[in-house]
Amino acid sequence: MTIATASARARPSSLQYAKDLLLLAKPRLSGLVIVTSAGGLALAPGHVAPARAALTVLATAAVVGAANALNCWMEREIDARMRRTRDRPLPAGRVDPFTALGLGIMVPVFALPVLALVANPLTAALAFVALVTYVAVYTPMKQRSTLALLVGAVPGAIPPLMGWTAATGRLDAGGLALFALLFAWQLPHFLAVSIYLRDDYARGGLRVFSIVHGERTTRAWIAATAAALVPVSLLLVPLRVAGPSYGAVAAVLGVALAGYAFAGVGREGGRWARNFFLATILYLTLLFVALFLGAR
């Protein structure tokens, strides 16, 4: 079924349509942005008024949601070929492509000035960099090169840095360490996704790591990047973003995740990759809990 055919379906209810508009923003990804940007605000030195902090986080989430909507618009034909994504609002014909495009363009027009006013111009500039990198570089690059993994990790790691700069007004070692942590975490996380969704990505014509380099090589890179995550997560201690209790928890969690990654190097099939993907989510959740509880 083509997208044009799907668009001819009956108009959904107002509630369903509102839900579909929200789905364009990819709520799970936007939710992670809310948590990490709020985390950057909370961990940064100094005090930020609650109203200002809330507006900063909401404006950040709005920019990221708009980037996701533009990604959905650009990849609607690809999504229609993939089982995991073919029921998304655009390939299923429940939302008109021009609506998604309009939201993706107009929301940042309002959200970026809000960030500049309630936070500072530096934070708004970081949001703009994340938007452009995700939409104009990462999204088209997914069909051409496995380097899209590294490029896509940049906008994914910027939200906690935005939270930090919103509180401090500057780029410094503490904020960059938070950026490095989220950047490093995404590598084994999405490499695992490329294994257990390999067939679906192949249907979509996306050049993910497991398709180009093979599953065994991908598993080896999962182990290597999971191991690299351990020292990166510990950088927050000498930089005095977090205390020794966080360091102890981060070391245990990191070694456990890396051990699980190395145990999967010689395995076959997608089950382990799916379990490792879930393990990375648990790891990040527990790490942020420890980070908040062990902050200096």
From Swiss-Prot:
GO cellular component: plasma membrane
UniProt cross-references to Pfam families, sorted A to Z: UbiA
Segments traversing the membrane: 29-49, 54-74, 98-118, 121-141, 147-167, 175-195, 221-241, 246-266, 275-295
Bilayer topology: Multi-pass membrane protein
InterPro entries referenced in this protein's UniProt entry, alphabetically: Protohaem_IX_farnesylTrfase (IPR006369), UbiA_prenyltransferase (IPR000537), UbiA_prenylTrfase_CS (IPR030470), UbiA_sf (IPR044878)
Major enzyme class: transferase
Subcellular localization, as worded in the UniProt entry: Cell inner membrane
Database matches in Gene3D superfamilies: UbiA prenyltransferase (1.10.357.140)
Pathway field: Porphyrin-containing compound metabolism; heme O biosynthesis; heme O from protoheme: step 1/1
GO biological process terms held by the UniProt record: heme O biosynthetic process
Main location: membrane
Listed EC numbers: 2.5.1.141
A molecular function GO annotation: protoheme IX farnesyltransferase activity
Keywords: Cell inner membrane, Cell membrane, Heme biosynthesis, Membrane, Transferase, Transmembrane, Transmembrane helix
Family: Belongs to the UbiA prenyltransferase family. Protoheme IX farnesyltransferase subfamily.
Extra remark beyond the main annotation: Carbon 2 of the heme B porphyrin ring is defined according to the Fischer nomenclature.
Function: Converts heme B (protoheme IX) to heme O by substitution of the vinyl group on carbon 2 of heme B porphyrin ring with a hydroxyethyl farnesyl side group.
HAMAP family (alphabetical): CyoE_CtaB
NCBIfam families found in the cross-reference section: cyoE_ctaB
Protein name: Protoheme IX farnesyltransferase
Naturally occurring in which organism (per UniProt): Anaeromyxobacter sp. (strain Fw109-5)
Gene designation per UniProt: ctaB
